[in-house]
Regions:
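Short catalytic micro-motifs in class I SAM-dependent methyltransferases
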Residues: 124-128
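A conserved beta-strand element that flanks and buttresses the S-adenosyl-L-methionine
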Residues: 121
Length: 211
C-alpha cells in the first residue's frame, strides 16, 4: 500500500465491510494485519496491567469485534467476565451472531442490557470514521467505560513510520495523535500501551506511569 493511498479527512465513509475485506485483512495468512496469537499477546499485557492497577474486569464491551479474536482470548484471561461483541459489518453479524451497531450511536443499555462496562475494547475502528463521527465515538467510549478502555487507532505518524503498509488498510481517515489525546484526556488517564483508565475508576498512577 503506497502512502498516496491513505485517505484524507474529506473522503467518503466506507459503507460496508464485506467478505472480501475480511478475507484480505484477517483470513489470508500472507495479507492479514493480525491474528489471534497477536491479540493474545496484546490482551495478556492489558490483563496484567489492569490487574496491577487493581481494575477488576467483570464485563467487556468489544466495539468493532470483527472476527472475534478478543472474545477468544477474553475467555482465557477473564473467564468470569461477560463479553459483549458489537460489530458494524452486516456480513460478520450474520456469520458470528454479533449485535449489529456502530460506535457512533450505539444505545448500549437498550441493545445490550447495560450502559457501562469494566473494560471497553475499540481496536482499529476509529480511523474508518470522519472527524465528526470519531469525536462522537470517543464521547461514547468515555460514557461506556467504568474501568478501562483499550484503544488502537491508526494515526498519520503511524502510517508514515510505524505500520507495515503492505498489510495495513490505507483507505482510512488519518489524524494526528493529539486529536485523540485531547478528547480522551477529559475522561481518561493515559496509562500507556493503549490503555486508558476512566477517571471514574479512581486509579492512582505515579507520574512516570502515565498522564
Amino acid at each position: 500500500m503506497s502512502k498516496s493511498n491513505a485517505t484524507k479527512n474529506g473522503a467518503k465513509e466506507r459503507e460496508s465491510f464485506g467478505a472480501d475485506y475480511y478475507q484480505r485483512y484477517y483470513d489470508n495468512e500472507e495479507t492479514r494485519v493480525s491474528d489471534v496469537s497477536e491479540i493474545r499477546r496484546l490482551a495478556t499485557f492489558v490483563a496484567g496491567y489492569l490487574e496491577y492497577l487493581q481494575v477488576p474486569v467483570r464485563s467487556i464491551l468489544d466495539v468493532g469485534c470483527g472476527v472475534g479474536n478478543w472474545q477468544t482470548v477474553s475467555k482465557e484471561l477473564w473467564p468470569q467476565a461477560r463479553y459483549y461483541g458489537v460489530e458494524y459489518s452486516e456480513h460478520l453479524c450474520k456469520q458470528f451472531g454479533w449485535q449489529q451497531g456502530s460506535v457512533t450511536n450505539l444505545n448500549a443499555k437498550a441493545k445490550l442490557g447495560r450502559a457501562s462496562f469494566d473494560l471497553v475494547v475499540c481496536q482499529g475502528v476509529l480511523q474508518y470514521l470522519d472527524d465528526r463521527a470519531a469525536a462522537a465515538a470517543l464521547k461514547n467510549l468515555a460514557k461506556w467505560s467504568d474501568g478501562a478502555l483499550y484503544l488502537e487507532a491508526l494515526t498519520k505518524k503511524d502510517w508514515r513510520e510505524n505500520c507495515d503498509q503492505s498489510v495495513t488498510d490505507g483507505d482510512v481517515h488519518l489524524r494526528s495523535g493529539s486529536f485523540y489525546r485531547e478528547r480522551l484526556g477529559k475522561h481518561f488517564q493515559d496509562c500507556g500501551g493503549g490503555v486508558f483508565c476512566s477517571r471514574r475508576a479512581g486509579v492512582a498512577l505515579f507520574e512516570l506511569e502515565g498522564e
